[in-house]
Amino acid sequence: MVNRILDLLIQYKAVEFGDFTLASGAQSKYYIDVKTAIMQPELLSEIAAEVAKKYDFECIAGVAVGGVPLAVAVSLAANKPCAVIRAAAKDHGKSQMIIGNVKGQRVLLIEDVTTSGGSSKYGVEELRKAGALIDSVVTVVDREGGAEELLAAEGITLHPLVKASELLA
C-alpha cells in the first residue's frame, strides 16, 4: 500500500538523528519534527484530506502548539468546526482552556506526534471537562512509546497515520 503521508514526511525531512529529550522526558536518538514538516502545504493538505475523509466527527480539536495547524486544516477540509486546547491557563482575558464550542459534540483530537500519550490524555481530559464526546485520537506519527495503551485505559482509540517503525524503516 502506498502511504503518501509517509512519503511526504520523508521528503520534508521530518526525522532528525542525534540526542534528543522528548516532551515525555524520555531520551531518544531520533526526533520526529512533524511541526516543521507540516508547514509545507502539500503535506498539511494531504493529512487534512485523509483525516476529513476517514474519520467521523462533528468537531476537530488540537492541543497547542502542534495540533493547532492540523486541526485548522482538517476543519477546512471537512467543513466542520475546530477547537484549540490551551497548553496552560491564561492569567488574563477569558480563562477558558478550550477555544471553540465542544459541548455535546463528537470531537476528534488530532496530534502531530504521540510517544507516551501524555499530551493526548491531557487533551482528552480537557475536552471531557468541557462536555465533549470523545473516543478517538488521530496522530500523524506514533512513536510507539505507550500512547496507544495509555489512551486505551481511558476508553480512547489511537489512530496513527504513520508509525515511527514505518518512518524509520
Swiss-Prot record:
Belongs to the purine/pyrimidine phosphoribosyltransferase family. PyrE subfamily. Keywords: Glycosyltransferase, Magnesium, Pyrimidine biosynthesis, Transferase. Catalyzes the transfer of a ribosyl phosphate group from 5-phosphoribose 1-diphosphate to orotate, leading to the formation of orotidine monophosphate (OMP). Coiled coil: none annotated. Pathway: Pyrimidine metabolism; UMP biosynthesis via de novo pathway; UMP from orotate: step 1/2. InterPro entries: OPRT (IPR023031), Or_phspho_trans_dom (IPR004467), PRibTrfase_dom (IPR000836), PRTase-like (IPR029057). HAMAP family: PyrE (MF_01208). The keyword Lipid metabolism does not apply. It catalyses: orotidine 5'-phosphate + diphosphate = orotate + 5-phospho-alpha-D-ribose 1-diphosphate. Orotate binds at T115, R143. 5-phospho-alpha-D-ribose 1-diphosphate binds at R86, K90, H92, E111, D112, V113, T114, T115, S116, G117, G118, S119. Pfam families: Pribosyltran. It is an enzyme of class 2 (transferase). It comes from Methanocorpusculum labreanum (strain ATCC 43576 / DSM 4855 / Z). The lineage of its organism: Archaea, Methanobacteriati, Methanobacteriota, Stenosarchaea group, Methanomicrobia. This is Orotate phosphoribosyltransferase. Homodimer. GO terms for biological process: 'de novo' UMP biosynthetic process; pyrimidine nucleobase biosynthetic process. GO terms for molecular function: magnesium ion binding; orotate phosphoribosyltransferase activity. Its EC number is 2.4.2.10. Its cofactor is Mg(2+). NCBIfam families: pyrE.
